Swiss-Prot record:
The gene is atpF1. It is found in: Cell inner membrane. It comes from Methylorubrum populi (strain ATCC BAA-705 / NCIMB 13946 / BJ001) (Methylobacterium populi). It comes from the Bacteria. F-type ATPases have 2 components, F(1) - the catalytic core - and F(0) - the membrane proton channel. F(1) has five subunits: alpha(3), beta(3), gamma(1), delta(1), epsilon(1). F(0) has three main subunits: a(1), b(2) and c(10-14). The alpha and beta chains form an alternating ring which encloses part of the gamma chain. F(1) is attached to F(0) by a central stalk formed by the gamma and epsilon chains, while a peripheral stalk is formed by the delta and b chains. One of its GO terms (cellular component) is plasma membrane. This is ATP synthase subunit b 1. F(1)F(0) ATP synthase produces ATP from ADP in the presence of a proton or sodium gradient. F-type ATPases consist of two structural domains, F(1) containing the extramembraneous catalytic core and F(0) containing the membrane proton channel, linked together by a central stalk and a peripheral stalk. During catalysis, ATP synthesis in the catalytic domain of F(1) is coupled via a rotary mechanism of the central stalk subunits to proton translocation. Component of the F(0) channel, it forms part of the peripheral stalk, linking F(1) to F(0). CDD domains: ATP-synt_Fo_b. The lineage of its organism: Bacteria, Pseudomonadati, Pseudomonadota, Alphaproteobacteria, Hyphomicrobiales. One of its GO terms (molecular function) is proton-transporting ATP synthase activity, rotational mechanism. InterPro entries: ATP_synth_b/b'su_bac/chlpt, ATP_synthase_B_chain.
């Protein structure tokens, strides 16, 4: 057993471990592992902090986006209301304009009708006077007839024009 290679490898390994332990190698390894564990823990804490910060930024972004969408909807609704109000005002103005134009046209037509009616009456009165004058001249002779015709024609003419 003392002459086998495995025995001497085991003895060398145990001797190596004793030397490492005496020199403080184990404490160096544990301190190295502890510092590595601290560094990993620190990196995990940093990653957790960054993740929370990113989540806060994402929540803020979502909140701002919803606010912007609400504001855009409010702007669109306001613009739609303004457009409807302006269209209604335009229709009202157009209807008022058409009503005024119609009323003015009707007034002009009524005035033209009244003027035409007056002209027709005047023409009818003149024609009636001339016809009456012609008939009376043919049937009546003398100065008295002339005076009677003139008085009657003036009376008829004034009544027809009134």
């Amino acid at each position: 057993m003392l002459l086998t290679a495995e025995f001497w490898v085991a003895v060398a390994f145990v001797a190596f471990l004793v030397i490492v332990w005496r020199v403080g190698g184990f404490s160096m390894m544990t301190s190295g592992l502890d510092s590595r564990a601290k560094r990993v823990r620190h990196e995990l804490d940093e990653a957790r902090r960054l993740r929370e910060e990113a989540a806060a930024v994402l929540a803020d972004y979502k909140r701002r986006r919803t606010e912007a969408e609400r504001e855009a909807e409010a702007i669109v609704a306001g613009a739609r209301e303004d457009a409807e109000r302006i269209a209604a005002e335009g229709h009202a103005r157009l209807n008022d304009f058409v009503a005024r134009r119609t009323k003015a046209a009707e007034a002009k037509i009524a005035q033209a009708e009244a003027q035409a009616s007056a002209q027709v009456r005047a023409a009818a009165a003149d024609a009636a006077v001339k016809v009456s004058e012609t008939l009376l001249r043919e049937r009546l002779q003398g100065g008295a007839a002339q005076d009677l015709v003139r008085a009657s024609l003036g009376d008829v003419k004034s009544r027809l024009q009134a």
